[in-house]
Each structure stands twice: as C-alpha cells, then as structure tokens.
Amino acid sequence: MAKQGDLKTQPRSEVQLELLRLDVGSAVALVGHPIHVMMVHFPVAFVIATLGVDIFFWWSGDAFWVRVGLWSAGMAFWSGVAASVVGTGELLLVRGIRLLEASWSHAVAAMTLVAIGGANWGLRLVDTAAILPHGLALSALASVMVGFAGWHGGKLVFDHGVGILISPKD
C-alpha cells in the first residue's frame, strides 16, 4: 500500500498536475481512442499531397495532375471538415479543453486551414486554368497552415495532456 508522500502516487510533471486539475479527456472516442486524433492525419496528408501534385503540374504541364489535384484538394477539404466537426465537439463538450488558450489557437488555425482548403478545391472546380499560380499559392498557404494547426494540436497533447484519458463523463 502506498503512503501519502510516496512518489508513485504523486504527480511528477506539470502535465500530470493539469490532468488532475482539469478534465481534458476525450469525450468523442471510439473504444477509448479519441476520434479527432484518428481523423486529422487524412486532411494533413491530402493538403501536402495537393501541394506536391501542383508542383508536378507546374513542372510537367501534364493535365493528369489537374484531375489528381482536384480530387486531392476535395479530399483535403472534406476530410478536414469531418475532423473539424469532431474537434469542435471535443472543444464544446469538455470544459477543461475549452479553458485552455491553446485549444482556441488550434481551433482558429484549423478553421483557417479548412477555409483555405475549401477555396483551393472551389478554385479547381470552377477554373482549372487558375491552378497556376492561384491553386499553387493556396496549396502552399494550406501547407503552412497545416504546420500552425499541427503545432498547436501537438501542444494540446504533449503540454496539456488533451485526449490522453477518456472523459469521466463516459
């Protein structure tokens, strides 16, 4: 049996202290795994792929890359919308997450990324001739925003322990 002052029973880091103080567990989870964390990889991958596709189109001029870019940008946008819906659910349902400033920074960066992704996909739907330079610029901007959103999302997990535990409400 552990004593009151035993190191094994006492939190040893700021993250552990914050986990005890705030409820920052996941409220939107599947078999104990936060759904938002499982979903965010897809829009990130599609945003980066769209930038690569645009660079290939710029380099080769092959119309094949126009169609691939349309699909990639569309998947980036729609998978981003899906991840955003789940992330917004976490933000609204878990008080401890709402209280963290980093949560709001991540949310704003992610919403900006989804808006840029939507503009990028919409541009490709309407005017394929505008891919160079506007689509390429939007793809580059979206890739930069992936970095900002990912940085703030990582801070939530590694600095604040968000999503590490299931919410006690479950």
Residue ranges and their predicted role:
Residues 2-60, 67-170:
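Polytopic transmembrane helical bundles with strong interfacial aromatic enrichment
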